[in-house]
Amino acid sequence: FKEWKNAFKRFINNIPFYGAAIICIDDPTIQSIISEIEDKKIITYGLSPQADFRATNIVFKDSKTFFSLEISPKKDASAKKIENMVSNIPGIHNVQNILSVCSMAVELGIDLEIIKLALLGFEGVNRRFSLIKNYKGIQIFDDYGHHPIEIKATLSASREITNDKVVAIVQPHRYTRLKLLFEDFTSAF
């Protein structure tokens, strides 16, 4: 684990002076690493109150995600809050993905209203929690998640958008992956 932390720090330290590291601060290990990095521009995102880009008031409804985007003040700017952000893809993990993209877009100088409109028009990626059919209130999704962590995230997103029963059908992708991660696969459900 120490090797992983050192590799992450080396990666951040290799960012050129004109670049920035956009990092999810929700993980305690990442929080400890950030405090050890000097002379690099760090932009954080996540659900944590310490994040530079933070989602609040998150609501999942009808396979959509609604939230507010809060941008913390920096030396050269004031705090901002963008209400009524809407995403067509559910799941806390997707909210975190959206926050990372918003962070990058703002860093590149893209207007917040353009970011909001782009998010509203984004339908997701094919076979990543794609709604295939809605039959008599039963929603059928397709997701290519083939790793236990991805499967857990998809099932979590499923449970966030319904109070009803969630049924998952899995097709193991690779024998060696299944064999090596069998315990993780069995606990993913």
Tell what function each PLM region has:
Residues 1-140, 163-164:
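Acidic, Mg2+-coordinating active-site environments of NTP-dependent enzymes
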Residues 1-2, 35-39, 154-156, 181-185:
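Short, glycine/charged-enriched secondary-structure capping and boundary segments
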Residues 1-5, 148, 178:
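A conditional alpha-helix N-cap/helix-loop micro-motif detector
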Residues 32, 105, 150-151, 179:
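Short, function-defining helix-loop hinge/capping sites that tune catalysis or transport
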Residues 92, 109, 146, 173-174:
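Short, glycine-/Ser/Thr-/acidic-enriched flexible segments
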Residues 100, 146, 150:
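Conserved cofactor-binding/catalytic machinery of classical short-chain dehydrogenase/reductase
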Residues 125, 149, 155-189:
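Active-site beta-alpha connecting loops in nucleotide-dependent enzymes
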Residues 140-146:
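Switch II (G3) loop of P-loop NTPases
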